[in-house]
């Protein structure tokens, strides 16, 4: 085998027929490279779709954090090993209409009392510091979040269809956690999920 390889290489260098015989091999390599690239692209496509979903923001209920028309990447595995935390921005199946997906911020966790009074949101009577909202809420109310459910609000408090209207979000309805704004390109950024901060801290 070594002798044959040496002969082919020598013939190629000398411009013998072996040089022409090398062309099909080059084409095979090109085709093989293309096939490998296509296979890798398909694997990556299905792999990414298995762990994430891409959604379009439709409306203004999450301004100023998210803008109408932006596209975001949602991590579907975020809550397989844990549960949503206060401040997380989540995409979920609307409990009232299973054909509709919504995106809101988690405010109340199971067992907590959520109160909205005088433009402030409070958890167990302790006000939250919310620098991300568009304006203080104009509505008032008190809610106690049941086990296995969440209380979610839009950052644009007075223009949002959320838990202050239709009550609680079952955890099983959560699709995933919003992690990245990827379109349009000038708005590309990792979504910053506000840590739990109480007013006065």
Task: Tell me the role of every PLM-derived stretch.
Residues 1-201:
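Extended hydrophobic leader/signal-anchor segments used for secretion and membrane insertion
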């Amino acid at each position: 085998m070594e002798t044959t390889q040496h002969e082919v290489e020598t013939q190629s260098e000398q411009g013998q027929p072996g040089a022409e015989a090398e062309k099909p091999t080059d084409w095979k390599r090109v085709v093989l490279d293309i096939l490998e690239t296509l296979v890798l692209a398909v694997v990556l496509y299905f792999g990414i779709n298995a762990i994430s979903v891409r959604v379009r923001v439709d409306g203004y209920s999450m301004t100023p954090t998210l803008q109408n028309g932006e596209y975001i990447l949602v991590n579907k595995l975020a809550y397989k090993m844990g549960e949503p935390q206060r401040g997380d921005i989540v995409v979920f199946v609307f409990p009232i209409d299973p054909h509709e997906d919504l995106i809101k911020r988690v405010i109340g966790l199971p067992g907590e009392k959520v109160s909205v009074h005088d433009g402030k949101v409070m958890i167990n009577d302790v006000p939250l510091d919310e620098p991300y909202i568009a304006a203080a809420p104009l509505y008032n109310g008190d809610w106690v979040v049941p086990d296995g459910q969440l209380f979610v609000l839009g950052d644009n408090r007075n223009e949002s269809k959320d838990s202050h209207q239709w009550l609680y979000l079952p955890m099983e309805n959560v699709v995933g956690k919003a992690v990245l704004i990827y379109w349009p390109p000038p708005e590309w950024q990792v979504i910053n999920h506000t840590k739990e901060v109480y007013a006065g801290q």
